[in-house]
Amino acid sequence: MKHVAVIDIGKTNAKLALVESEGLREIAVVTRPNVVLQDGPYPHFGLDGHWQFFLRHLADFQSAHGVDAISVTTHGASIVLLDENGDLATPMLDYEHTGPDTLAAEYDALRPDFSVTGSARLPMGLNVGAQVH
């Protein structure tokens, strides 16, 4: 493997880096703001814009350097739900949205203990289970 394209979706920015696997050196990097949208049922991220950004720059990286593999990294509280066609079923919740806290008592009654999950109970949507609940 020579060049790995790394998709890194962070809270502030979405980034695409092309990394040489031998020396782990970034040879190309592009970023775009990860803006929280306020329309829809709750604060969420604009995934359509990210998709177009990544497609365009992956093609550019392929043309300029070649891409041998793609790796994705993101915050562990970031998820999307897909429908039977593979399309988004719901917008991707901003995991700092306090909406899940309004259902905290119900969720906490169902949530297994840390000794079972290995995951601490966190506020807002920082636990995927709280988002889905």
Regions found by a protein language model. Name each.
Residues H3-L47, D87-D94:
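Short glycine-rich, Thr/Ser-proximal phosphate-binding strand/loop in the N-terminal lobe
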Residues V29-G66, T102-A105:
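N-terminal phosphate-binding loop and adjacent alpha-helix
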